[in-house]
Protein backbone atom coordinates (compact mmCIF):
# COMPACT_ATOMS: atom_id res chain seq x y z
CA UNK A 1 0.00 0.00 0.00
CA UNK A 2 2.90 2.34 0.66
CA UNK A 3 4.15 1.77 -2.90
CA UNK A 4 0.69 2.24 -4.36
CA UNK A 5 0.25 5.55 -2.56
CA UNK A 6 3.02 7.04 -4.68
CA UNK A 7 1.55 5.99 -8.02
CA UNK A 8 -0.29 8.63 -10.02
CA UNK A 9 -3.97 8.19 -10.85
CA UNK A 10 -3.25 8.06 -14.58
CA UNK A 11 -0.74 5.24 -14.08
CA UNK A 12 -3.27 3.31 -11.98
CA UNK A 13 -5.63 3.43 -14.95
CA UNK A 14 -2.81 2.13 -17.16
CA UNK A 15 -2.21 -0.77 -14.77
CA UNK A 16 -5.92 -1.62 -14.64
CA UNK A 17 -6.00 -1.73 -18.44
CA UNK A 18 -3.21 -4.30 -18.59
CA UNK A 19 -3.89 -7.84 -19.78
CA UNK A 20 -2.69 -9.32 -16.48
CA UNK A 21 -5.16 -7.25 -14.44
CA UNK A 22 -8.02 -8.03 -16.79
CA UNK A 23 -7.36 -11.78 -16.61
CA UNK A 24 -7.12 -11.77 -12.82
CA UNK A 25 -10.01 -9.49 -11.93
CA UNK A 26 -12.57 -9.49 -14.74
CA UNK A 27 -14.65 -11.90 -16.73
CA UNK A 28 -17.04 -11.14 -19.57
CA UNK A 29 -19.92 -13.45 -20.36
CA UNK A 30 -20.54 -14.13 -24.03
CA UNK A 31 -23.98 -14.72 -25.49
CA UNK A 32 -25.02 -18.33 -24.97
CA UNK A 33 -26.32 -19.97 -28.16
CA UNK A 34 -29.54 -21.90 -28.00
CA UNK A 35 -29.84 -25.57 -28.76
CA UNK A 36 -31.04 -26.35 -32.27
CA UNK A 37 -34.65 -25.23 -32.61
CA UNK A 38 -37.12 -23.94 -35.14
CA UNK A 39 -37.69 -20.53 -33.55
CA UNK A 40 -36.90 -17.75 -36.02
CA UNK A 41 -35.77 -18.06 -39.62
CA UNK A 42 -32.04 -18.18 -40.39
CA UNK A 43 -31.53 -15.44 -42.95
CA UNK A 44 -30.24 -11.94 -43.36
CA UNK A 45 -33.01 -9.31 -43.44
CA UNK A 46 -33.33 -7.25 -46.62
CA UNK A 47 -35.10 -3.99 -45.81
CA UNK A 48 -34.93 -2.59 -49.38
CA UNK A 49 -34.35 0.93 -48.08
CA UNK A 50 -37.28 0.88 -45.64
CA UNK A 51 -36.82 1.56 -41.90
CA UNK A 52 -38.22 -0.90 -39.37
CA UNK A 53 -35.73 -3.76 -39.59
CA UNK A 54 -33.77 -3.71 -36.34
CA UNK A 55 -30.66 -5.63 -35.30
CA UNK A 56 -30.26 -6.41 -31.61
CA UNK A 57 -27.44 -7.63 -29.39
CA UNK A 58 -26.42 -7.80 -25.71
CA UNK A 59 -23.37 -6.18 -24.13
CA UNK A 60 -22.06 -7.49 -20.81
CA UNK A 61 -20.47 -5.00 -18.44
CA UNK A 62 -18.15 -7.64 -16.95
CA UNK A 63 -17.85 -9.65 -13.74
CA UNK A 64 -15.31 -8.76 -11.08
CA UNK A 65 -14.26 -10.72 -7.99
CA UNK A 66 -17.29 -12.97 -8.36
CA UNK A 67 -19.72 -10.06 -8.58
CA UNK A 68 -21.92 -10.15 -11.68
CA UNK A 69 -22.09 -7.11 -13.95
CA UNK A 70 -25.14 -5.62 -15.62
CA UNK A 71 -26.13 -5.96 -19.30
CA UNK A 72 -26.99 -3.47 -22.03
CA UNK A 73 -29.48 -4.36 -24.78
CA UNK A 74 -28.55 -2.57 -27.99
CA UNK A 75 -31.03 -2.31 -30.88
CA UNK A 76 -30.24 -0.54 -34.18
CA UNK A 77 -32.35 0.04 -37.27
CA UNK A 78 -30.48 -1.08 -40.38
CA UNK A 79 -31.53 1.72 -42.73
CA UNK A 80 -31.54 4.81 -40.49
CA UNK A 81 -29.21 3.56 -37.72
CA UNK A 82 -31.78 4.75 -35.18
CA UNK A 83 -30.56 3.27 -31.91
CA UNK A 84 -32.23 2.36 -28.62
CA UNK A 85 -30.24 1.12 -25.61
CA UNK A 86 -31.70 -0.33 -22.44
CA UNK A 87 -29.78 -1.54 -19.36
CA UNK A 88 -30.93 -4.50 -17.26
CA UNK A 89 -29.61 -6.38 -14.25
CA UNK A 90 -29.75 -9.77 -15.96
CA UNK A 91 -30.75 -11.17 -19.34
CA UNK A 92 -33.37 -13.51 -17.93
CA UNK A 93 -36.99 -13.41 -19.11
CA UNK A 94 -37.99 -11.46 -15.98
CA UNK A 95 -35.90 -8.48 -17.14
CA UNK A 96 -35.75 -8.96 -20.91
CA UNK A 97 -39.44 -8.97 -21.83
CA UNK A 98 -40.33 -5.68 -20.05
CA UNK A 99 -37.17 -4.10 -21.49
CA UNK A 100 -37.94 -5.24 -25.04
CA UNK A 101 -41.51 -3.92 -24.77
CA UNK A 102 -40.18 -0.46 -23.88
CA UNK A 103 -37.47 -0.58 -26.55
CA UNK A 104 -39.76 -1.62 -29.38
CA UNK A 105 -42.20 1.13 -28.43
CA UNK A 106 -39.36 3.69 -28.40
CA UNK A 107 -38.69 3.45 -32.14
CA UNK A 108 -40.61 6.25 -33.91
CA UNK A 109 -41.40 4.15 -36.99
CA UNK A 110 -43.32 0.92 -37.47
CA UNK A 111 -41.19 -2.16 -36.89
CA UNK A 112 -41.25 -5.01 -39.40
CA UNK A 113 -38.26 -7.21 -38.56
CA UNK A 114 -36.29 -8.19 -35.46
CA UNK A 115 -32.89 -9.81 -36.12
CA UNK A 116 -30.67 -11.32 -33.42
CA UNK A 117 -27.77 -13.70 -33.14
CA UNK A 118 -28.54 -17.12 -31.70
CA UNK A 119 -28.50 -15.99 -28.07
CA UNK A 120 -31.07 -17.68 -25.86
CA UNK A 121 -32.17 -14.31 -24.44
CA UNK A 122 -33.78 -13.55 -27.85
CA UNK A 123 -34.49 -16.93 -29.42
CA UNK A 124 -37.20 -18.18 -27.08
CA UNK A 125 -40.98 -18.55 -26.93
CA UNK A 126 -41.54 -15.48 -24.74
CA UNK A 127 -39.85 -13.18 -27.24
CA UNK A 128 -41.73 -14.84 -30.11
CA UNK A 129 -45.03 -14.24 -28.30
CA UNK A 130 -44.17 -10.55 -27.84
CA UNK A 131 -43.13 -10.11 -31.48
CA UNK A 132 -46.17 -11.95 -32.80
CA UNK A 133 -48.42 -9.63 -30.81
CA UNK A 134 -46.75 -6.67 -32.53
CA UNK A 135 -46.65 -8.37 -35.97
CA UNK A 136 -42.85 -8.26 -36.09
CA UNK A 137 -40.92 -10.99 -37.88
CA UNK A 138 -38.07 -12.76 -36.05
CA UNK A 139 -34.93 -13.74 -37.96
CA UNK A 140 -31.60 -15.00 -36.65
CA UNK A 141 -28.02 -15.11 -37.90
CA UNK A 142 -26.89 -17.92 -40.17
CA UNK A 143 -24.09 -20.29 -39.29
CA UNK A 144 -20.62 -19.00 -40.24
CA UNK A 145 -22.08 -15.72 -41.55
CA UNK A 146 -20.44 -13.24 -39.19
CA UNK A 147 -21.78 -10.18 -41.03
CA UNK A 148 -25.44 -11.02 -40.43
CA UNK A 149 -25.51 -9.01 -37.18
CA UNK A 150 -22.47 -6.83 -37.87
CA UNK A 151 -24.31 -3.52 -37.53
CA UNK A 152 -25.39 -4.17 -33.93
CA UNK A 153 -21.95 -5.54 -33.03
CA UNK A 154 -20.17 -2.51 -34.50
CA UNK A 155 -22.48 -0.19 -32.56
CA UNK A 156 -21.63 -2.12 -29.40
CA UNK A 157 -18.06 -0.86 -29.77
CA UNK A 158 -18.58 2.59 -31.29
CA UNK A 159 -21.35 3.73 -28.95
CA UNK A 160 -22.01 1.48 -25.93
CA UNK A 161 -18.39 0.68 -25.09
CA UNK A 162 -17.12 4.10 -26.10
CA UNK A 163 -19.52 5.90 -23.76
CA UNK A 164 -20.04 3.37 -20.94
CA UNK A 165 -16.62 1.72 -21.12
CA UNK A 166 -15.41 -1.76 -20.27
CA UNK A 167 -15.11 -1.42 -16.49
CA UNK A 168 -17.25 -3.60 -14.28
CA UNK A 169 -20.58 -2.09 -13.19
CA UNK A 170 -22.51 -4.10 -10.55
CA UNK A 171 -26.02 -5.22 -11.42
CA UNK A 172 -27.76 -3.12 -8.79
CA UNK A 173 -26.74 0.04 -10.68
CA UNK A 174 -28.84 -0.97 -13.71
CA UNK A 175 -31.72 1.48 -12.96
CA UNK A 176 -29.34 4.44 -12.68
CA UNK A 177 -27.43 3.52 -15.84
CA UNK A 178 -30.67 2.99 -17.74
CA UNK A 179 -31.97 6.38 -16.59
CA UNK A 180 -28.81 7.92 -18.07
CA UNK A 181 -29.41 6.01 -21.30
CA UNK A 182 -32.97 7.22 -21.74
CA UNK A 183 -32.39 10.81 -20.67
CA UNK A 184 -29.06 11.52 -22.36
CA UNK A 185 -27.49 8.72 -24.40
CA UNK A 186 -30.37 7.68 -26.68
CA UNK A 187 -31.35 11.29 -27.61
CA UNK A 188 -27.68 12.10 -28.24
CA UNK A 189 -27.18 9.09 -30.53
CA UNK A 190 -30.29 9.75 -32.61
CA UNK A 191 -30.40 13.55 -32.82
CA UNK A 192 -26.81 14.74 -32.42
CA UNK A 193 -24.29 12.03 -33.40
CA UNK A 194 -23.70 11.78 -37.18
CA UNK A 195 -23.26 8.32 -38.73
CA UNK A 196 -21.65 7.20 -41.96
CA UNK A 197 -24.08 5.87 -44.57
CA UNK A 198 -22.66 3.88 -47.49
CA UNK A 199 -23.01 4.80 -51.14
CA UNK A 200 -22.84 1.89 -53.59
CA UNK A 201 -20.58 2.47 -56.62
CA UNK A 202 -19.52 0.22 -59.51
CA UNK A 203 -15.75 -0.21 -59.88
CA UNK A 204 -13.76 -0.79 -63.09
CA UNK A 205 -14.37 -4.55 -62.86
CA UNK A 206 -18.11 -4.13 -62.64
CA UNK A 207 -18.28 -5.04 -58.95
CA UNK A 208 -20.32 -3.14 -56.40
CA UNK A 209 -18.30 -1.32 -53.77
CA UNK A 210 -19.47 0.65 -50.76
CA UNK A 211 -18.01 4.11 -50.24
CA UNK A 212 -18.31 6.02 -46.97
CA UNK A 213 -18.15 9.73 -47.73
CA UNK A 214 -18.20 12.61 -45.28
CA UNK A 215 -20.84 14.42 -47.31
CA UNK A 216 -23.19 11.48 -46.73
CA UNK A 217 -22.96 11.65 -42.93
CA UNK A 218 -26.26 12.25 -41.14
CA UNK A 219 -27.81 11.78 -37.73
CA UNK A 220 -30.34 8.92 -37.59
CA UNK A 221 -33.12 11.51 -37.29
CA UNK A 222 -31.97 13.36 -40.41
CA UNK A 223 -31.54 10.09 -42.30
CA UNK A 224 -35.10 9.05 -41.40
CA UNK A 225 -36.45 12.42 -42.44
CA UNK A 226 -34.56 12.28 -45.76
CA UNK A 227 -36.31 9.09 -46.93
CA UNK A 228 -38.90 9.43 -49.70
CA UNK A 229 -42.30 10.11 -48.15
CA UNK A 230 -40.78 9.52 -44.71
CA UNK A 231 -44.04 10.28 -42.91
CA UNK A 232 -45.54 7.00 -44.11
CA UNK A 233 -43.14 5.05 -41.87
CA UNK A 234 -43.95 6.89 -38.63
CA UNK A 235 -46.09 5.32 -35.94
CA UNK A 236 -49.54 6.76 -35.38
CA UNK A 237 -49.39 10.00 -33.42
CA UNK A 238 -45.71 10.70 -34.20
CA UNK A 239 -44.67 13.62 -36.43
CA UNK A 240 -41.47 15.33 -37.51
CA UNK A 241 -41.04 18.36 -35.29
CA UNK A 242 -39.03 21.35 -36.40
CA UNK A 243 -35.81 21.67 -34.45
CA UNK A 244 -34.24 24.96 -33.52
Question: What role is predicted for each listed range?
Answer:
Residues 1-113, 118-146, 150-244:
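Secondary-structure boundary/capping micro-motif
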Amino acid sequence: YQRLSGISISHLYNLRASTTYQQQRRHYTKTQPTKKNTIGERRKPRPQGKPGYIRIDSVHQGDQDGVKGLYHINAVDEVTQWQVIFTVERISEQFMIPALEVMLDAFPFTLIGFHADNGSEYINKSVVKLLNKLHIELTKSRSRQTNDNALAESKNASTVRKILGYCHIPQHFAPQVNAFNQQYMVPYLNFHRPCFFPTTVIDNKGKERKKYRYEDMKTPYDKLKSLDNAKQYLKKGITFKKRA
